[in-house]
Amino acid sequence: MLSKLASLQTVAALRRGLRTSVASATSVATKKTEQGPPSSEYIFERESKYGAHNYHPLPVALERGKGIYMWDVEGRQYFDFLSAYGAVSQGHCHPKIIEAMKSQVDKLTLTSRAFYNNVLGEYEEYITKLFNYNKVLPMNTGVEAGETACKLARRWGYTVKGIQKYKAKIVFAVGNFWGRTLSAVSSSTDPTSYDGFGPFMPGFETIPYNDLPALERALQDPNVAAFMVEPIQGEAGVIVPDPGYLTGVRELCTRHQVLFIADEIQTGLARTGRWLAVDHENVRPDIVLLGKALSGGLYPVSAVLCDDDIMLTIKPGEHGSTYGGNPLGCRIAIAALEVLEEEHLAENADKMGAILRKELMKLPSDVVTAVRGKGLLNAIVIRETKDCDAWKVCLRLRDNGLLAKPTHGDIIRLAPPLVIKEDEIRESVEIINKTILSF
C-alpha cells in the first residue's frame, strides 16, 4: 500500500513538472513570437541545444534562396559558392522544378515499390536513354547509390565473373568519400570518417588515387569485382587526376574483367562542364552513380545506371527502398534533368569555370598556393599561418557576401550553381580577391 502511495505521489510530481515545463516552453515561445522572427544567434543556440553535434556549420542562418543567391534571417544577401555540395546546380528554387513538384504533390507522392506508379517508368525511360544505359535502379541519397553499386558488384562477381562466394573484393582510391554509412566509412582513409566506428566491412581495399600502376597491381587479384572511383575527388579537396587516368582505368578494368564504377554523385550532371565528368575522356563506366543535382536540391533522389548483364543479377526482393522510385521524386528528377539540358548548363559550367579559374590564378600566391578544378567544381588552397587559414577566410568571405566552406583543412571548395553568369562570376571574384587581400 505504501509503495502504491509512493508511486502515485511520484506520478503526481511528474505531472506537475510536465505542466510546469509545458507552461515554461509556451511562455518562451510566446515571448519569442512577441520579439519577432528568430535571430541568427538564437538559431545557432537552438540547434546546438536540441540537435546532434555531427556538423560544424559556418555561422550563418539562412531562410531563403533564389538562383545563385541566399539570404539569412536578418535579410543579408550572399552568393552561394557551395550549392549544397552540388545539389542545387540548377539554382535555388528553380521555377520549372518547383512547378513539377507542385503538379505531382497533389496527385500522388508515394506508393512504395509494392505497386506500379505512372511516373517511374517515364523517368526510367528518360534517364536511361539520356545516359545510354539499359537499366536504372532508383534510390534516394548518394550513399544509397554507393551501397547499391557495391551489392551489384559483389553479386556480379559471384554470378558472372565466378568469384568464390563471399570472397569478392572492391577496390577504392585513397581520399574517396561517398557517405557515412558503415560501408562507406569502411572504404575511407580519413580518420574523421572511420575512427571509432569499427569493425569494418570486409572485402574493401584502397590504392592511391591517380595511380594506374597501383591499380594494375590490385587488379591482378582474381577476386576483385570492381573499382569504384570519383572522376574528380570532391571531399578530398577537388583533386583532378592526370589526363588519361580515366582512360587507363577503363582499359585496366576491361583487361582484368573488373567493373569500373564511376561515382558521379558530385561531379556528374553538368558540374564539370560535361554531362558526366568521365565524358572529358570519352570513357563509359560499367556502373554510374548519380545524385545531388538529380533533384535540383528539392528532394533526395539518386540513381544507379548500368546494363542488363549487371543490373539483372539482382532479383525481386533482394534490394530496394520504400521511397526509391516514388512518383514525386521521379517527377522532380525529370524536370531537373530537363533544366540541365534546356538551359545548356554543362556548356555554361565549362565557360564560367574557365573564367573563374583564370581570375583566381591572379590571387596573391603567398596566401593562395594553388587553384584547381574543372567546370564549376573548383578549389583554392590557403597557406596556413597563425592569422590565416581556410576557416578564417570563409568567415571573412561570409562577411563580404559570399558563402563557401573549407574541405580538409587548408582547401576551400568553390562550386556555385551552374546558372551563374559572367558578370556574377566577376563580382564574386572581386569579393574573393578583397577577402584574400585583407589577410
UniProtKB/Swiss-Prot annotation:
Pathway: Amino-acid biosynthesis; L-proline biosynthesis; L-glutamate 5-semialdehyde from L-ornithine: step 1/1
InterPro entries from the UniProt entry: Aminotrans_3 (IPR005814), Aminotrans_3_PPA_site (IPR049704), Class-III_PLP-dep_AT (IPR050103), Orn_aminotrans (IPR010164), PyrdxlP-dep_Trfase (IPR015424), PyrdxlP-dep_Trfase_major (IPR015421), PyrdxlP-dep_Trfase_small (IPR015422)
Top-level lineage group: Eukaryota
SUPFAM superfamilies for this protein: PLP-dependent transferases (SSF53383)
Gene Ontology terms: biological process: arginine catabolic process to glutamate; arginine catabolic process to proline via ornithine; L-proline biosynthetic process; ornithine metabolic process
UniProt modified residues of type N6-(pyridoxal phosphate)lysine: 292
Catalyzed reactions: L-ornithine + 2-oxoglutarate = L-glutamate 5-semialdehyde + L-glutamate
EC id: 2.6.1.13
Subcellular location(s) per record: Mitochondrion matrix
Keyword Nuclease applies: no
Transit peptide (first-last residue): 1-35
N6-succinyllysine modification, residue list: 102, 107, 362, 405
Keywords of the record: Acetylation, Aminotransferase, Mitochondrion, Pyridoxal phosphate, Transferase, Transit peptide
Recorded GO MF terms: identical protein binding; N2-acetyl-L-ornithine:2-oxoglutarate 5-aminotransferase activity; ornithine aminotransferase activity; pyridoxal phosphate binding
Gene3D superfamilies, alphabetized: Aspartate Aminotransferase, domain 1, Type I PLP-dependent aspartate aminotransferase-like (Major domain)
Residues where N6-acetyllysine is found: 49, 66, 107, 362, 386, 392, 405, 421
GO CC terms in record: cytoplasm; mitochondrial matrix; nucleoplasm
Cofactor(s) listed in the protein's UniProt record: pyridoxal 5'-phosphate
Quaternary structure annotation from Swiss-Prot or TrEMBL: Homohexamer.
Family: Belongs to the class-III pyridoxal-phosphate-dependent aminotransferase family.
Function: Catalyzes the reversible interconversion of L-ornithine and 2-oxoglutarate to L-glutamate semialdehyde and L-glutamate.
NCBIfam families: Orn_aminotrans
UniProt name for this protein: Ornithine aminotransferase, mitochondrial
Originating species: Rattus norvegicus (Rat)
